Curated annotation (Swiss-Prot):
<dbReference type="InterPro" id="IPR020818">
    <property type="entry name" value="Chaperonin_GroES"/>
</dbReference>
<dbReference type="GO" id="GO:0051082">
    <property type="term" value="F:unfolded protein binding"/>
</dbReference>
<comment type="function">
    <text>Together with the chaperonin GroEL, plays an essential role in assisting protein folding. The GroEL-GroES system forms a nano-cage that allows encapsulation of the non-native substrate proteins and provides a physical environment optimized to promote and accelerate protein folding. GroES binds to the apical surface of the GroEL ring, thereby capping the opening of the GroEL channel.</text>
</comment>
<dbReference type="InterPro" id="IPR037124">
    <property type="entry name" value="Chaperonin_GroES_sf"/>
</dbReference>
<dbReference type="GO" id="GO:0005524">
    <property type="term" value="F:ATP binding"/>
</dbReference>
<keyword id="KW-0963">Cytoplasm</keyword>
<dbReference type="GO" id="GO:0046872">
    <property type="term" value="F:metal ion binding"/>
</dbReference>
<comment type="subunit">
    <text>Heptamer of 7 subunits arranged in a ring. Interacts with the chaperonin GroEL.</text>
</comment>
<dbReference type="GO" id="GO:0044183">
    <property type="term" value="F:protein folding chaperone"/>
</dbReference>
<dbReference type="GO" id="GO:0051085">
    <property type="term" value="P:chaperone cofactor-dependent protein refolding"/>
</dbReference>
<dbReference type="GO" id="GO:0005737">
    <property type="term" value="C:cytoplasm"/>
</dbReference>
<keyword id="KW-0143">Chaperone</keyword>
<protein>
    <recommendedName>
        <fullName>Co-chaperonin GroES</fullName>
    </recommendedName>
</protein>
<dbReference type="GO" id="GO:0051087">
    <property type="term" value="F:protein-folding chaperone binding"/>
</dbReference>
<dbReference type="Pfam" id="PF00166">
    <property type="entry name" value="Cpn10"/>
</dbReference>
<comment type="similarity">
    <text>Belongs to the GroES chaperonin family.</text>
</comment>
<dbReference type="InterPro" id="IPR018369">
    <property type="entry name" value="Chaprnonin_Cpn10_CS"/>
</dbReference>
Length: 103
C-alpha cells in the first residue's frame, strides 16, 4: 500500500461538509491571567478552507453549501470531527452544524 500525504489542499469535503481551520483560543483572561490548556474553552470560530459540492436532493440535483472558502463561521461547540494537520487544528463539519457567518 502506498503512503498518502495529507495536507490542507488535498482535503476535499463530500456532500454538505465544510472543512474549517480553527481560530486559536484565548491564551489569557481579560485580567491578564494565563490559562492552562485544560482550562481553555473549545473554540467555536474558524475560517472555511474547503467546501463540499452540496447536499444531493431526491431528484439528483444538489443544494449548494451557503458558506464559501475564506468565510469566518461560528459553529456548534461539540460538532464535527477534529483534525490536526501540519501542527494546525481543523474541524470537518456538516453544514447544519454551522450557526452563522461572522464578519
Amino acid at each position: 500500500m502506498a503512503a498518502v500525504s495529507i495536507n490542507v489542499t488535498t482535503v476535499k469535503p463530500l456532500g454538505d461538509r465544510v472543512f474549517v481551520k480553527v481560530s486559536p483560543s484565548e491564551e489569557k483572561t481579560a485580567g491578564g491571567i494565563f490559562l492552562p490548556d485544560a482550562a481553555k474553552e473549545k473554540p467555536q470560530i474558524g475560517e472555511v478552507v474547503a467546501v463540499g459540492p452540496g447536499k444531493r436532493n431526491d431528484d439528483g440535483s444538489r443544494t449548494p453549501v451557503e458558506v464559501g472558502v475564506g468565510d469566518k463561521v461560528l459553529y456548534s461547540k461539540y460538532a464535527g470531527t477534529d483534525i490536526k494537520l501540519g501542527g494546525e487544528e481543523f474541524v470537518l463539519l456538516s453544514e447544519k452544524d454551522i450557526l452563522a457567518a461572522v464578519s
